[in-house]
């Protein structure tokens, strides 16, 4: 009789452990895919939508500025992003300090590098998606690693050993964080989102290198002939 009770107890124990394991696995699976269908989709931006970021680079240290949707050109199918800091806009014009300034495509939020749109984001977000793009002078192979708490996390590696890690917020419609490390492991660019808002009032800036050259020429010209 005691042997029978022991056998029944062991069976019940094993069954409980099995169920616990299944529950744990299901919970882990659910946690790894916790984005709503809406959050997985390509966002639609509006003029004035903005994101306040802290930018960190080895050249310039830490600075904060807002990326702002300054214009929507439905004819060309492009957004134009400006920035609230003129200094940051000038840095971008000289050394491509911020790759998300300027034109981005409406249909994919593709970023322009050397005049060609680059698919940095993969909508709708799906774990395991893999794709390639060029950004920051590097050719990247990227993979969507996880969907968690409304965010899609992407890991990318370049042929030169650089690493790019970034998180896209489905609820805020843009990057939550981005970190670019070079082949030595040094952080070359870090972006951290502080707050996202729908309306912006104020000046925004975007310069190309040609703009700065023209501006310098005009200033020098005025000094000479005044």
What are these model-derived regions, one by one?
Residues 23-91, 110-226:
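Acidic, serine/threonine-rich low-complexity disordered tracts
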Residues 95-111:
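A cross-kingdom signal targeting lumenal/periplasmic-facing segments of multi-pass membrane
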